[in-house]
């Protein structure tokens, strides 16, 4: 039978012992402030303390002291309280410092809680932004609905009803409260995001819209004016032609002032289409850095936390970015591998040998040595000195020649690291004559 309250009661007793400095055998010094704790508790709660205390496990009788300069005492107080109570006190001001200290101390539970806290704060900020933009969309939508009424009232002031100046399909659209449906106009909330228009397209749009909003000819107006006289018809036709010319001129000058509710000008696009404009969505809550994607923000937060989640499988070194790890592995570990010149396979000092032909040296594996018939190489000391790997470039490799050979041949001094050849030549007879001539006077 398991008693769930036993764990919490045990933590309370240990925390009380820590506060009263009872059986505390470990001291942690953080920027001059000393914290008392128990080895067993620190060993069980932190991977860093587990590694540190296991190295000093033989000296259990002596008290252990650990010093840290990477985080502040307030940050370590939050972590130590979590170790002894299971309660983590996170705020918007200390979450980055606590996460950085937990990453250094290798406390995965604290890191996961800090990540969840940061993600929740980002979600809240995103919801506030979405709410703000939804309210702005409603405002722009209400402005777009009211514009047809302004358009119709302007025609009423000129002396005619709006129904008399529109085609038969346009009249019911205004009465039903859904204006300009025949011209593919939708409120801002129903529109799908579109890319920003180019400058030359924006200039051509007002002219195109005058064609779509073309007013009917006088003959069409006569068709709707039932019971009116011919004189009334001619006067109204003349009035419509003048009004049509005036509207076209106004639309070319300023499409917004003419009452077009779906004009694609720069001003209206910024009011009705806030989502079309490029806006940076994610802002770091601890600095002024702003990014577009959540993955970029997650990578940026590692600058504050010091987290390095990508370890090198060869040497164990950790990196904060995956491209840094691949570059490290390619330049450090792969570049130093020895390769057989013939088969291009990786060889070692045991599976290959260095072959020297004159001043040229290269490495061959044992199989390639057997194929080329060089398996019976002399094993005396002089030849062994020439079999030097590229890593032993600091050793001095010289030709061992007798004095007679030095007189007759050119002495070659070879540098193993850079494969440089330096020739030391005796002075010729011509140079000796030049040195003697100044003395004969």
From Swiss-Prot:
What does the record give under GO molecular function?
Answer: DNA-binding transcription factor activity, RNA polymerase II-specific; DNA-binding transcription repressor activity, RNA polymerase II-specific; RNA polymerase II cis-regulatory region sequence-specific DNA binding; RNA polymerase II-specific DNA-binding transcription factor binding; transcription cis-regulatory region binding; transcription coactivator binding; zinc ion binding
The segments labelled Disordered in the record are: 135-248
From which residue to which do the C2H2-type zinc fingers run? Answer: 282-304, 310-333
Coiled coil (UniProt feature): none
Question: Spans of biased composition, class Basic and acidic residues?
Answer: 198-208, 227-242
Phosphoserine modifications at:
161, 167
Q: Which UniProt keywords apply?
A: DNA-binding, Isopeptide bond, Metal-binding, Nucleus, Phosphoprotein, Repeat, Transcription, Transcription regulation, Ubl conjugation, Zinc, Zinc-finger
- Can you list the GO cellular component terms from the UniProt entry? nucleus
Pfam families attached to this UniProt entry: BTB, zf-C2H2
Location in or out of the cell: Nucleus
Sorted alphabetically, the Gene Ontology BP terms of this entry are: negative regulation of transcription by RNA polymerase II; regulation of transcription by RNA polymerase II
**Top-rank taxon, per record:** Eukaryota
The record places the cross-link (Glycyl lysine isopeptide (Lys-Gly) (interchain with G-Cter in SUMO2)) at 178, 182, 199, 437
Tell me where in this chain the BTB domain is found: 24-92
Briefly state the protein's biological role.
May be involved in transcriptional regulation.
PANTHER family in the record, alphabetically? AGAP004733-PA, ZINC FINGER AND BTB DOMAIN-CONTAINING PROTEIN 8A
Q: What is this protein called?
A: Zinc finger and BTB domain-containing protein 8A
The organism encoding this protein is Rattus norvegicus
């Amino acid at each position: 039978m398991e008693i769930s309250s036993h764990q919490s009661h045990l933590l309370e007793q240990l925390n009380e012992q820590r506060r009263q400095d009872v059986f505390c055998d470990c001291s942690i010094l953080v920027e001059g402030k000393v914290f008392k704790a128990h080895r067993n508790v620190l060993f069980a709660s932190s991977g860093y303390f587990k590694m540190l205390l296991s190295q000093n496990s033989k000296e259990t009788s002596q008290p252990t002291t650990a010093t840290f300069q990477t985080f502040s005492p307030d940050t370590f107080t939050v972590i130590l309280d979590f170790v002894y109570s299971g309660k983590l006190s996170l705020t918007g001001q200390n979450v980055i410092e606590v996460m950085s200290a937990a990453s250094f101390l290798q406390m995965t539970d604290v890191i996961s809680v800090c990540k969840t806290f940061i993600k929740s704060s980002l979600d809240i900020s995103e919801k506030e932004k979405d709410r703000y933009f939804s309210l702005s969309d409603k405002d722009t939508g209400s402005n777009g609905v009211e514009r047809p009424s302004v358009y119709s009232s302007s025609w009423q002031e000129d002396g005619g009803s709006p129904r008399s100046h529109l085609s038969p399909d346009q009249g019911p659209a205004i009465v039903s409260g859904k204006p300009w449906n025949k011209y593919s106009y939708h409120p801002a909330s129903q529109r799908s995001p579109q890319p920003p228009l180019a400058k030359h397209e924006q200039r051509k749009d007002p002219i195109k819209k005058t064609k779509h909003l073309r007013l009917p000819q006088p003959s069409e107006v006569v068709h709707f004016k039932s019971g009116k006289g011919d004189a009334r018809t001619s006067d109204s036709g003349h009035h419509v032609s003048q009004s049509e010319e005036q509207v076209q001129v106004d639309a070319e000058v300023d499409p917004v002032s003419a009452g077009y509710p779906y004009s694609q000008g720069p001003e209206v696009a910024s009011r009705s289409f806030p989502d079309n404009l490029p806006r940076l969505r994610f802002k770091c809550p601890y600095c002024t850095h702003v990014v577009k994607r959540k993955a970029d923000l997650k990578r940026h937060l590692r600058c504050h936390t010091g987290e390095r989640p990508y370890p090198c499988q060869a040497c164990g070194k950790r990196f904060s970015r995956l491209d840094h790890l691949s570059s490290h592995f390619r330049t450090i570990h792969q570049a130093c591998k020895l390769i057989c010149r013939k088969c291009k396979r990786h060889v070692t000092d045991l599976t290959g040998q260095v072959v020297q032909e004159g001043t040229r040296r290269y490495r061959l594996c044992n199989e390639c040595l057997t194929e080329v018939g060089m398996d019976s190489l002399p094993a005396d000391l002089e030849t062994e000195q020439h079999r030097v790997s590229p890593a032993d470039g600091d050793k001095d490799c010289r030709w061992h020649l007798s004095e007679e050979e030095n007189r007759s041949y050119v002495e070659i001094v070879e540098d193993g690291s850079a494969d440089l050849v330096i020739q030391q030549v005796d002075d010729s007879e011509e140079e000796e004559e030049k040195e003697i001539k100044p003395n004969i006077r």
